[in-house]
Amino acid sequence: MAPHSADTAGLVPSDELRLRTSNSKGPEQEQTLKKYTLEDVSRHNTPADCWLVIWGKVYDVTSWIPNHPGGSLIHVKAGQDSTQLFDSYHPLYVRKMLAKYCIGELVPSAGDDKFKKATLEYADAENEDFYLVVKQRVESYFKSNKINPQIHPHMILKSLFILGGYFASYYLAFFWSSSVLVSLFFALWMGFFAAEVGVSIQHDGNHGSYTKWRGFGYIMGASLDLVGASSFMWRQQHVVGHHSFTNVDNYDPDIRVKDPDVRRVATTQPRQWYHAYQHIYLAVLYGTLALKSIFLDDFLAYFTGSIGPVKVAKMTPLEFNIFFQGKLLYAFYMFVLPSVYGVHSGGTFLALYVASQLITGWMLAFLFQVAHVVDDVAFPTPEGGKVKGGWAAMQVATTTDFSPRSWFWGHVSGGLNNQIEHHLFPGVCHVHYPAIQPIVEKTCKEFDVPYVAYPTFWTALRAHFAHLKKVGLTEFRLDG
């Protein structure tokens, strides 16, 4: 749909923009392209042999991996369709660089069914007018202001404050005072700072939006391992699954459910009688999110090789070491040291630890759930592996903001109050989101793309629990 506003000054016309950004080859080259199936591509799934599918073409990017500015993100979906991740992480001009790595085109085959949960086709994949325009506008903002979107000076100060607060509260909770109430006070702060590591440090680090220096960004991403959870598994679930297939049932691992399950977030999912009360008991169970991730989910993903519909990629030796050594380091400083040098009995220590993890779990659950599990968002139902709507427009339709221009919530939530902007531009440091938010909202209005922003966090949280109550009472429907 064309914009219904005449305010397009400085924009490249859509047709010209397509020509300038298209990665397609000429007619003679098209005829020489080899044909590959998804099964063929899936065999090339390591950093040493990395093929990607982007807009139906097959690319061998193995030689580019050592020079890739985004570091390991280039092979996070090695051997799979990476269309959505490629486009959301790269400026438009990078499309032109793809041609040199093109080795063929994707063709359907009888064996495609086993890869269907890793591939989803959106309308207007390469030439979605809304996305081309909003990307051009946001890129122009950063270029005209001479700003690197991956960098913001506040991030270093913020990270030092969070990590310092985490370890200070850890010490004060377990080693400083024998008073249970004093220790509980600091244990709760430890839980708060652990959540802040999750939303403010590792989130940007694992999205490649913390810094332009690859090694440093990777280290900041591994801060999640420092607080007990796995950065590798987080990238698989969040970057590979959630960002590619937001709110699409049976594709997005963030809304996955078993049958039966304690939670139901869409009417296309199985309903049990107790879902009528999920808006009550989930308020409590959300607190177990961090504990579940640390002690159960990460290991299940490793040993089963999947996170819901997402097939877990092969670990590199470095990723393997970070995964297991991170778990051992966490167990050592969190359990061994307090048991040897701490001032509390085993039972008191365990109670303090669980209390801290409940705070972490509630913070993470509430901040993420209000963005995608409310009545005002869409839960797309694909037909034949296709979604009716462009990928970018569907990112907006499946996501909400809250307090989008709040300095306080921008920092406390790690930019999750600007989830729409984050889903469109995951490679941008979250501190920049308030600046580009008006650009995104304005463009959405011009293209009739629904843009939902709750005025406060509490409004968004109430909307989430109202949705849980409504869905818990609604009968199963195939059409959502």
From Swiss-Prot:
<feature type="region of interest" description="Disordered">
    <location>
        <begin position="1"/>
        <end position="30"/>
    </location>
</feature>
<comment type="similarity">
    <text>Belongs to the fatty acid desaturase type 1 family.</text>
</comment>
<dbReference type="InterPro" id="IPR036400">
    <property type="entry name" value="Cyt_B5-like_heme/steroid_sf"/>
</dbReference>
<dbReference type="InterPro" id="IPR001199">
    <property type="entry name" value="Cyt_B5-like_heme/steroid-bd"/>
</dbReference>
<dbReference type="GO" id="GO:0016717">
    <property type="term" value="F:oxidoreductase activity, acting on paired donors, with oxidation of a pair of donors resulting in the reduction of molecular oxygen to two molecules of water"/>
</dbReference>
<dbReference type="Pfam" id="PF00173">
    <property type="entry name" value="Cyt-b5"/>
</dbReference>
<comment type="function">
    <text>Fatty acid desaturase that introduces a cis double bond at the 5-position in 20-carbon polyunsaturated fatty acids incorporated in a glycerolipid that contain a Delta(8) double bond.</text>
</comment>
<feature type="short sequence motif" description="Histidine box-3">
    <location>
        <begin position="419"/>
        <end position="423"/>
    </location>
</feature>
<keyword id="KW-0276">Fatty acid metabolism</keyword>
<keyword id="KW-0479">Metal-binding</keyword>
<dbReference type="GO" id="GO:0042759">
    <property type="term" value="P:long-chain fatty acid biosynthetic process"/>
</dbReference>
<feature type="short sequence motif" description="Histidine box-1">
    <location>
        <begin position="203"/>
        <end position="207"/>
    </location>
</feature>
<dbReference type="GO" id="GO:0006629">
    <property type="term" value="P:lipid metabolic process"/>
</dbReference>
<dbReference type="InterPro" id="IPR005804">
    <property type="entry name" value="FA_desaturase_dom"/>
</dbReference>
<dbReference type="InterPro" id="IPR012171">
    <property type="entry name" value="Fatty_acid_desaturase"/>
</dbReference>
<keyword id="KW-0408">Iron</keyword>
<dbReference type="GO" id="GO:0006636">
    <property type="term" value="P:unsaturated fatty acid biosynthetic process"/>
</dbReference>
<feature type="transmembrane region" description="Helical">
    <location>
        <begin position="151"/>
        <end position="171"/>
    </location>
</feature>
<keyword id="KW-0560">Oxidoreductase</keyword>
<feature type="transmembrane region" description="Helical">
    <location>
        <begin position="173"/>
        <end position="193"/>
    </location>
</feature>
<dbReference type="Pfam" id="PF00487">
    <property type="entry name" value="FA_desaturase"/>
</dbReference>
<keyword id="KW-0249">Electron transport</keyword>
<feature type="short sequence motif" description="Histidine box-2">
    <location>
        <begin position="238"/>
        <end position="243"/>
    </location>
</feature>
<dbReference type="GO" id="GO:0016020">
    <property type="term" value="C:membrane"/>
</dbReference>
<feature type="transmembrane region" description="Helical">
    <location>
        <begin position="348"/>
        <end position="368"/>
    </location>
</feature>
<feature type="domain" description="Cytochrome b5 heme-binding">
    <location>
        <begin position="33"/>
        <end position="107"/>
    </location>
</feature>
<keyword id="KW-0349">Heme</keyword>
<keyword id="KW-0443">Lipid metabolism</keyword>
<keyword id="KW-0444">Lipid biosynthesis</keyword>
<protein>
    <recommendedName>
        <fullName>Acyl-lipid (8-3)-desaturase</fullName>
        <ecNumber>1.14.19.30</ecNumber>
    </recommendedName>
</protein>
<dbReference type="GO" id="GO:0046872">
    <property type="term" value="F:metal ion binding"/>
</dbReference>
<keyword id="KW-0472">Membrane</keyword>
<keyword id="KW-0275">Fatty acid biosynthesis</keyword>
<feature type="binding site" description="axial binding residue">
    <location>
        <position position="90"/>
    </location>
    <ligand>
        <name>heme</name>
    </ligand>
</feature>
<keyword id="KW-0812">Transmembrane</keyword>
<keyword id="KW-0813">Transport</keyword>
<feature type="transmembrane region" description="Helical">
    <location>
        <begin position="322"/>
        <end position="342"/>
    </location>
</feature>
<feature type="binding site" description="axial binding residue">
    <location>
        <position position="68"/>
    </location>
    <ligand>
        <name>heme</name>
    </ligand>
</feature>
<dbReference type="GO" id="GO:0102866">
    <property type="term" value="F:acyl-lipid (8-3)-desaturase activity"/>
</dbReference>
<feature type="transmembrane region" description="Helical">
    <location>
        <begin position="280"/>
        <end position="300"/>
    </location>
</feature>
<keyword id="KW-1133">Transmembrane helix</keyword>
